[in-house]
Curated annotation (Swiss-Prot):
Gene that produces this protein: CYTH2
Annotated transmembrane regions: none
SUPFAM superfamilies named among the record's database cross-references: PH domain-like (SSF50729), Sec7 domain (SSF48425)
Organism field: Chlorocebus aethiops
InterPro entries: PH-like_dom_sf, PH_domain, Sec7_C_sf, Sec7_dom, Sec7_dom_sf
Protein name (record): Cytohesin-2
Chain ranges of the SEC7 domain: 54-241
Amino acid sequence: MEDGVYEPPDLTPEERMELENIRRRKQELLVEIQRLREELSEAMSEVEGLEANEGSKTLQRNRKMAMGRKKFNMDPKKGIQFLVENELLQNTPEEIARFLYKGEGLNKTAIGDYLGEREELNLAVLHAFVDLHEFTDLNLVQALRQFLWSFRLPGEAQKIDRMMEAFAQRYCLCNPGVFQSTDTCYVLSFAVIMLNTSLHNPNVRDKPGLERFVAMNRGINEGGDLPEELLRNLYDSIRNEPFKIPEDDGNDLTHTFFNPDREGWLLKLGGRVKTWKRRWFILTDNCLYYFEYTTDKEPRGIIPLENLSIREVDDPRKPNCFELYIPNNKGQLIKACKTEADGRVVEGNHMVYRISAPTQEEKDEWIKSIQAAVSVDPFYEMLAARKKRISVKKKQEQP
């Protein structure tokens, strides 16, 4: 036995040499195994470091993406710019459209505002966005339900016009032969949206029946009439189930009154009882709201400014007066509503709204601000223009 290692006494010199070689090889293998263990340990440490680094990168990317969505919801153009600059989004219409279509964490009002812009990139994104919608074999109401749920229509007439034109083109491409032209699809789409408002808005008392809906849409199919069965199906669908319009957190009344065009104390002459009452007025979003106190969360009355005009008037009882009125009025009341003392919401009772400002200067400022806010209903304007185009085209085709 040498160094504690047993060695049989009857080994030949050759066997001893072979045994020595085996022992040496064993020692070499043990050293090699130890070296491999150390290398494996180093490799595992490197892998763990890489994984931690990748996890950190993923976390950082997710944080930047969340920041980009927040920026988009506050300012769509700056939000897209931030995402592109941080390589979170490719600067192509198709990729931006896909990002908006998925809509994860995005404010649908902001999506609508971005899609409605007239810049070249926005227009290309709008068409790419519409192309992501599959309308094949859907009737018009079904297609509109899908389309109008993916964003919130902006308020500006020109933006609405571009978006509904893109919708009509896509619908006709997916469903060839249903309508003779995109103009027909465009006009009928607006008629359906207006029908939805008329049937389901509690402030609209005069609910149109099927016959009136059919009559409204006579001659819009390149001068011809659409099948009554088609119109009946659309009417029944809207009557039975209104459009679901996406609501965002930013659309509550608090947000509406957060940054008004003008606000201040004015005197308002009553409708039935001709007494002057001091009210806090807020002008925003083409509406005039009035409150009993500045701290009230809900307005006492709402006056939509669509189709109204404003003029200065002299009143023997109050100075600095102006009026809101309907041009060429034939006895109809201004469409408005107010809240009674018992909480009931009722229609207003004014053919004109007479208002008195504290000073001449404030009167002039209110008149200027209201004139800038007064609007004609874009739906009716655009429908009239498109129907006129269809009519002219039909006359040109006649021999």
